[in-house]
Amino acid sequence: MTEAAAPAGELTALGTPLRSFRFGAAGEGNKQEGGARKFVQTAQQAEEYGFDTFFVPDHLGDQIGPIAALGALTQATEKIRLGTSVLANGFRHPVVLAKDLATIDVLSKGRLEVGVGAGWKQDEFLAAGLPYETPGIRLEKLDETLTILDVLLRGQECNFEGKYYQVRGIKGTPRPRQGPRPPICTGGGGPKMLRLAAKHADIISIVPVTTKNGKGLLSGITLEKTIEKVNLIRDAAGDRFADIELNWAITAIVITDDREKTAEMALSAIERGLHPDLEVDVKLSVEDILNSPYVAIGSFEEIAEQIRRVRQLTSMSYVGVFPTQMDAFAPVIPLLRDE
């Protein structure tokens, strides 16, 4: 499982112990990153920079397949943890998936982090001839999958009679190296998904709400909205909340000696629709941009201080970046490594 390290006696604004920071980078092996040939080098570079985890997403477009990619990385890396961010549940049966994931954990000598989500990119499902059910059905299926994975990834025998999946006497083999099982990560931006994550996950990734066209709502990047989501998770998880590691991904990193001017320019670009992955549903201020957990602007020291503040206010401690931002973010890691 993930480590629950915390500086002795220090608490977040939510009253939970401060967790030590962890850092993850995600790579797709797409053309923007140099293609599949450079993928292994990207993971090795992340390891050299001091990232704790290297994640592979799961889509059917211009990128490599996550399971085979992780298999390669088990032999091409030594210490960095390996994860999926996140596997689309509708692409694989949970029993088959459990076998592949357990194998990855064995081959990596216990370095796997299992990220699984409901699947959200409708065009991929339809193009592949896979059923794309309603959000409610996809969440029900994910609930069943996470229940099955919890048993099989412990090396136990699974007997499960669900609405969507039936498993009869399958034992989880090979038994993963990690005990009691590799950590499970899931997450999202909506309340139903976050409650489901609070039920099952060891790691919860908090993201802005995504629209049907795949864009994130601008309102979701604010610190206030993020705190609302953390409070929802805390209420849903109950006593388990202190054992859950909270993750988020910084989507924009700008190294500059003028934070406010850069934030003004970023806000102007967003308002003019120049950020293709965001849907503008609210008017934000420069202060909102500077306080957002998802935007890092400033010197290395200023960004480190911003991340400390995010942890203090939200209990989030597991920081993710994209591979195109690894070089920019790497100098921040030593500033936070032992905190």
Range-by-range predicted roles:
Residues 1-339:
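Active-site-adjacent structural elements that line small-molecule/cofactor binding pockets in enzymes
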